[in-house]
Amino acid sequence: MIAEDIKEQAGAGRRTSAWYVNALETALSNLQVEDSDTIDTGGITLGSLFFFDYKVKHPEKYPFWDIQPLAVALRFDGDGFLGCNLHYINPDYRDAVAESLLNSGGGSVVPKNSIHKYLFSGMGSLYKVPDDEDWASISLLPTERFVDKRGRAYPKNRAFNWRK
């Protein structure tokens, strides 16, 4: 499984978030399959988990955002899709939410602050996480990368807020 392989590669040493992002992208890139049915939806299929680069269109509107979302596509919405970004969920609960989303095909109740609209135009590299992978373990890899309006790192613990 991907997450276990990445943890093994990391070993006991401290690794940066960028290292984990690179390791996950490398592992997922080997598993990507072209699907001509998703050409008009930017490669997105509802109920699937995706890891991608994201550039916000109007950064002035948001106090912070995740530039490396790990999101389950819930609904198409015009020029993008609504997704549950697991990175906004406290890691203590994230794996349970990921497992619930996998088992329900994206039909689970999730924290409100984890729902975000992603524009197709803001998406960079896109990797689908296969359904037979352990979404819960992948969700716990430290790949979240929050930035503020000025492009500076935003504290992860402030982004993990169930109350919003």
Regions found by a protein language model. Name each.
Residues 2-50, 58:
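Mixed-charge, Lys/Arg-rich low-complexity intrinsically disordered regions
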Residues 15, 45, 49, 80-85, ...:
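Compositionally biased, intrinsically disordered low-complexity regions
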Residues 50-51, 70-72, 136, 160-161:
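Generic ordered-secondary-structure signal
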Residues 61-101:
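Basic/aromatic-rich interaction segments and small domains that mediate binding to polyanionic partners
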Residues 88-164:
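Intrinsically disordered, low-complexity, charged/polar segments
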